[in-house]
Amino acid sequence: METLSQRLNVCQDKILEHYENDSKRLCDHIDYWKHIRLECVLMYKAREMGIHSINHQVVPALSVSKAKALQAIELQMMLETLNNTEYKNEDWTMQQTSLELYLTAPTGCLKKHGYTVEVQFDGDVHNTMHYTNWKFIYLCIDGQCTVVEGQVNCKGIYYVHEGHITYFVNFTEEAKKYGTGKKWEVHAGGQVIVFPESVFSSDEISFAGIVTKLPTANNTTTSNSKTCALGTSEGVRRATTSTKRPRTEPEHRNTHHPNKLLRGDSVDSVNCGVISAAACTNQTRAVSCPATTPIIHLKGDANILKCLRYRLSKYKQLYEQVSSTWHWTCTDGKHKNAIVTLTYISTSQRDDFLNTVKIPNTVSVSTGYMTI
């Protein structure tokens, strides 16, 4: 009994030293788990001898000591395997080598640099759950260690190892648990992923797909430096005249997307009269520029815009129409931002929209007028 008590004192003193030192060396953490294992063995032996209290500590049941010892052995072996690789030179804290983190999804491996992934179920901002993804996941299999990165998609959080995808968080199961299981939004790293994506149009359409034909203005009006024309208010348009290009083939349209051309026919060039901004005020729009409509172009990542467009359904009274996600076809592929266009009955309605709807910082807003 006395020998067992002395051994337990020495073992626990060593464990306390590791807590106080808070080392970042992997070899020190291996030694820590060796002593945790030894402590469990001593407790197991004490209970086996019929001892229920030692050094004023309650001796746990045999099954408890055995389970803790097995966990300590597993972690010790994991760290020893890692210690035989180049990763032993990295900084390792006690938290990063703790049992709690080891058992956190993905279980049975070490991980570093976690960040939060927020999932919103059923479009309810009050029905959200937070999950953890990891920048570095250390997989030790058959004595070999590999580092992979945790990734996120609409199905869940996963990593890829040797071509095999392993999901350690399944959003489908989580959605059934916390919602109807039909739809959810994933917010991670400044990106927004919406599921199911089928509720949105994923077609990439050109600007001609939105405005297929513009009315011809008979008279061209000169303007000041600020003008009101097709597109956004970025830049200044000059009064121009052009001739109508003859059409060689009839224009065919997609019955599912009436505004989208099926064949690569060009859109008619028209005499688009440029009207001064002063003449395009809301009060005089119906008289001086009856063919123009206030618009907003929202530019940014396609997934973020799809999510934003879905949320705009809550503010239908603040706009007239909203387009599907589209792109300019003549831009450099490296900077191919997606665009969503909204139209308004009046500029005051557009102002109310901008004052009410929260636009993400990653989405740029351009205002202007469109001839419809």
UniProtKB/Swiss-Prot annotation:
What family, per the record? Belongs to the papillomaviridae E2 protein family.
Q: What is its main location?
A: host cell
Region Transactivation domain, annotated ranges: 1-200
User: What are the start and end residues of every segment in region (Disordered)?
Assistant: 235-262
Any GO BP annotation: DNA-templated transcription
Which SUPFAM superfamilies does this one have?
A: E2 regulatory, transactivation domain, Viral DNA-binding domain
What is this protein's function?
A: Plays a role in the initiation of viral DNA replication. A dimer of E2 interacts with a dimer of E1 in order to improve specificity of E1 DNA binding activity. Once the complex recognizes and binds DNA at specific sites, the E2 dimer is removed from DNA. E2 also regulates viral transcription through binding to the E2RE response element (5'-ACCNNNNNNGGT-3') present in multiple copies in the regulatory regions of the viral genome. Activates or represses transcription depending on E2RE's position with regards to proximal promoter elements including the TATA-box.
Q: GO CC terms on record?
A: host cell nucleus
Subunit details: Binds DNA as homodimer. Interacts with protein E1; this interaction greatly increases E1 DNA-binding activity. Interacts with protein L1; this interaction enhances E2-dependent replication and transcription activation. Interacts with protein L2; this interaction inhibits E2 transcriptional activity but not DNA replication function E2. Interacts with protein E7; this interaction inhibits E7 oncogenic activity. Interacts with host TAF1; this interaction modulates E2-dependent transcriptional regulation. Interacts with host BRD4; this interaction mediates E2 transcriptional activation function.
- Residues of crosslink Glycyl lysine isopeptide (Lys-Gly) (interchain with G-Cter in SUMO)? K299
Q: Which Pfam families match?
A: PPV_E2_C, PPV_E2_N
Name this polypeptide is given: Regulatory protein E2
**PTM:** Phosphorylated. Sumoylation plays a regulatory role in E2 transcriptional activity.
